[in-house]
Amino acid sequence: KRVSIFSPGEIVIQNVGNWLATADKLGEFVGKTYFLKKDGTKINAKISIRPTFADGKSNAQTGYCGVTEVIDEDITVPINLSTKIIKGVAITRVPFTSASIFPMLAIAAYYAGLGDGLFSVTSLLLAVFGVLLLHLSSNVFNDYFDVSDGTDEANNEYFQPGGAAITGGSRAIELGIITLNKTKTVAISLLLASLLVAGFLFYNIYQVTGATSNVEGALAVGLSGLFLGYFYTARPLRLVARRGLGELAIFLAFGPLLTLGTGYAISAETIGFLSNEFYMLLSLGVPFGFLTTNILYINQFPDAESDAKTGKNHLVVTLGKKAARWGYLVILSLAFYSSVYLNDLLNVHENFNSNVFLVGNAVLYLFGLSIFMKLLKNYQKRELVNANIQTIILQTLFCVFYIISLNLFFI
């Protein structure tokens, strides 16, 4: 049994690594802690941890041996602020919010490249904060529903290099960091906070534009994103289990809808429905949507067996791992094709350099192809984790490249 099953999650995060390091260095760690029964009552204990070896200390270490002695002393383990922050990051998966925040900054760069005074900085800050909260809420809701459906519990092949959750959800509930019910409470709280920020944002949009049309557009896009994020794993729709609808939801929510919504939120002018600017904002989101979808897509490979057992029939389960490899290449190629397509549309702007844009796209596409080659080779191996991480890096680099290339005022 893992110690995290019966030890408070905060104690595991804060202390277990140091306990094991001390055992490695000194040959034994001796200390006091407490464990929890299923009913929540404490078991105060003295613990001893020693490293174990294959056949004597001259051979490879095979693990650790722990001895627990129940004691009468009431043990308390102070939890540091840094541990509480790490706990919050683990539960909400904060690092993944770069997938939503960076495309928003790219739209701000687009407006800055067009000229001065074309977007509201206040609206941008409110929009980024609101989307951040909404994204975190969606992450936590997804964990809640995946655990409720038994998907995460059935998954023993997830990737967590260095403790960072890459696939298989946050594992926060499984590690005892938070309970299932508290997960739902956190998700709802984050959602309500995002709606509160949205209220301030809508007021500022009206103050900037003097009209309600952008407010209505931002509201419609925001509700659409909320719908897709919630029902990605929530029943009765559970889009992730509907053979491609989950991937489509991610593409829309982190692509065209995100960039269009950002435009509605920050533009100093009203955006007409189906106007040229409306289509431009949608088009700018297409490559972002594809690259973010590929993050989700490649993360489905290590989880495929457990997902199939629990009815989570996404594209990798539907196609089978071997055939699904080529889906990554298709999505990657569509991302960069749609990006290069934007070259002619953007080339009319003063602070845009077509050569820089095309060369940057070519370099990043080659990086993407190198990731695809790793997927081709390692799709059934633990070494695939490198491709998973690099897919996240690719999406981030692409966003940063867009932020720079859409406003090359210094060239």
Residue ranges and their predicted role:
Residues 162-163, 168-271:
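Intramembrane alpha-helical segments
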Residues 345-410:
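Extended hydrophobic alpha-helices typical of membrane-associated regions
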Residues 1-10:
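PAS-family sensory/regulatory domains
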Residues 117-141, 216-230, 274-298:
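Membrane-embedded alpha-helical segments that form the functional core of polytopic membrane enzymes
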Residues 141-192, 289-333:
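Solvent-exposed interhelical
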Residues 34-40, 53:
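PAS-family sensory domains
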Residues 47-65:
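Short loop/turn elements at sensory-signaling interfaces that couple input to output
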Residues 11-14, 21-32:
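PAS/PAS-like sensory domains
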